[in-house]
C-alpha cells in the first residue's frame, strides 16, 4: 500500500473515532420518557439508563401497592425499549456503509 493511502486510512479512522465518541456522548445524554397506564405513570431516563424522574398521577394513590409497582415497572421497561431503539437508529446512520450485518451490536 502506498504511503499516502495508509495516511488516508489513518485519517479516516481517526475521523470515524471522533464521530463515534460524539455520537456516544449524544446517546448518553439523550432523555426518553417511558409511560404506562395510559400516561398515569411516566419515567424519564437517560441514554445511560439513569432514571431522572418518576411521575405518578394522583389517582394512583388510591390503588394497591402491587398495581402501582406493576405500572412503574412497565414504564421503566418502556423507557429502556425507547432508549435501545433510539441507540439503534443513531448507530445505523453512523455505521451505514461499513458493511455490517443488520442487527450487529457494536461493543460500546
Swiss-Prot record:
SUPFAM superfamilies named among the record's database cross-references: YbaB-like (SSF82607)
InterPro entries reported for this sequence: YbaB-like_sf (IPR036894), YbaB/EbfC (IPR004401)
Gene3D superfamilies cross-referenced by the UniProt entry: Nucleoid-associated protein YbaB-like domain
Pfam families: YbaB_DNA_bd
Compartments it resides in: Cytoplasm, Nucleoid
GO molecular function, one term: DNA binding
Key words, A-Z: Cytoplasm, DNA-binding
This protein's GO CC annotations: bacterial nucleoid; cytosol
Keyword Cytoplasm: yes
Function: Binds to DNA and alters its conformation. May be involved in regulation of gene expression, nucleoid organization and DNA protection.
Protein name per Swiss-Prot or TrEMBL: Nucleoid-associated protein Avin_19840
Species of origin: Azotobacter vinelandii (strain DJ / ATCC BAA-1303)
Amino acid at each position: 500500500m502506498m504511503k499516502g493511502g495508509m495516511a488516508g486510512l489513518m485519517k479516516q479512522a481517526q475521523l470515524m473515532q471522533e464521530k463515534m465518541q460524539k455520537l456516544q456522548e449524544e446517546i448518553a445524554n439523550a432523555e426518553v420518557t417511558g409511560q404506562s397506564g395510559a400516561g398515569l405513570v411516566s419515567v424519564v431516563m437517560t441514554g445511560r439508563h439513569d432514571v431522572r424522574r418518576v411521575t405518578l398521577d394522583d389517582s394512583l394513590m388510591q390503588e394497591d401497592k402491587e398495581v402501582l409497582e406493576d405500572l412503574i415497572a412497565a414504564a421503566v421497561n418502556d423507557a429502556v425499549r425507547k432508549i435501545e431503539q433510539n441507540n439503534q437508529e443513531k448507530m445505523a446512520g453512523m455505521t451505514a456503509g461499513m458493511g455490517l450485518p443488520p442487527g450487529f451490536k457494536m461493543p460500546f
